[in-house]
Amino acid sequence: MGVNFILQGAEANISRIKKGTEILQEEWNKTEQKAGDVFSDVRVTVKFHEGMELEVKRMKADVEIDCHEPAHFFRGLNWVLNHLEKAEGESEKKEKAYFAGNGLMLDCSRNAVFTVEKVKAMIRILAKLGLNRLLLYTEDTYEVPELPYFGVYRGRYSREEIREIDEYAQIFGIELIPCIQTLAHLHNALKWSEAQKIMDTPDILQVGKEETYEFIEKLLTAVKDSFHTRKIHLGMDEAVQLGLGNYLKENGYKNSSELIKEHCARVLEICRKLGLEPMIWSDMYITSNTGKSYYEVPENADCSDWKKPAPELGLVYWDYYNADTKIYEKMLNVHKQLSDKIVFAGGCWIWNGIAPNYSRSFTCTKAALTTCKKYEVPVVVDSDAHTDALVGCHCFAEKVIREIDFPEELIVNRSVEELKKFLNK
């Protein structure tokens, strides 16, 4: 027997979640029906409020969901779907989200590009977890009409496909955000002969060349025309050979901190022209100022003399490796001095072998998000994710929404059915 949700409440509230509810209901009825005596017709009353609390009450076949936004509603609805047994009687769930923006960065640049249907499936999972952002990491895997070789033979998304994904994400209250590259990590784009004139090193653009910024404007225009949001992640990380290739031959040596600031200023001009709200990975700003590795900054560092980004540029602090809260504290102290717009990006640890390293994911996520909460970081995302990282994503979501630690003995070396039972609590 399938479940049928009957939505109740203010019409304006129902309109925000009606389509998404129908999609999740249909998916459940096709794939996840419970055996036994369960409620079929379930009346759901929805209310939205200003606070970040989520409260779900189930009294037999009557459910009340009081929440902040659609993404939180769908998390509550997913809990209801897993607690429909008549024998369970009355039950309730209370949680609070600690970050206004939270979500996943889906890696669509390495090994394979997710199909549109697979991205939609990931969106449904994010909705069930209560996350409200999805970043598509596409180095060269999106269509730029004026650059036919950009992403060719790489499974790039067409503009129509991105728009389709975007519209689907909006159904669940999830903001689809482009995450591209405008400095380094562009090996696949720069391998073509037509791109040689804008190349510094094999994967880095040459700073200061007018052709470089004409190229970047084409990228940003294509992105603006494909995505609903005005937010954009410009990348710019790990450009360790910046200024040491063709730039050095043509212009002589220039400190990387000056080059990154010059490049950011030019790209920001384009963003202002197009009405975009940019952010970048922060490592180049930090390493170019210290002359050391990203995390090698002193305790209580004074950044008053550092070259800093423009006020409107967000900085994304990425940290996939550390389990010590003191490291996160010193790094967030530096970021707070550099920008008022900080985003934290953790990692799902799927890149170290043929299987995800869940233990490392759990340990790092706990340390990172505990510290981000303490420092009131407004936005957090889980990075470099694929479908084999879903348990890590679930861990991330639970730290975002509620204070929960994932005891490894409940997860490691468990059967699929045991894992499902744990995740559906």
Per-segment meaning from a language model:
Residues M1-F99:
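Contiguous, structured surface segment used for ligand recognition
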Residues W28, I171-F172, L274, L338, ...:
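Helix C-cap/helix->beta junction micro-motif
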Residues K60-M279:
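Feature activates predominantly on carbohydrate-active enzymes
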Residues L104, S109, E139-T141, C179-H185, ...:
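Active-site beta-loop-alpha junctions enriched in small/polar residues
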Residues L190-D203, S288-D305, K373, P378, ...:
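Short, electropositive alpha-helical surface patch
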Residues L234, V316, V379-V381:
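Residue-level marker for buried hydrophobic side chains located in beta-strands
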Residues L244, L248-K374:
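Catalytic-core regions of glycoside hydrolase
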Residues R360-K425:
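Charged catalytic cores and adjacent phosphate/nucleic-acid-binding surfaces used
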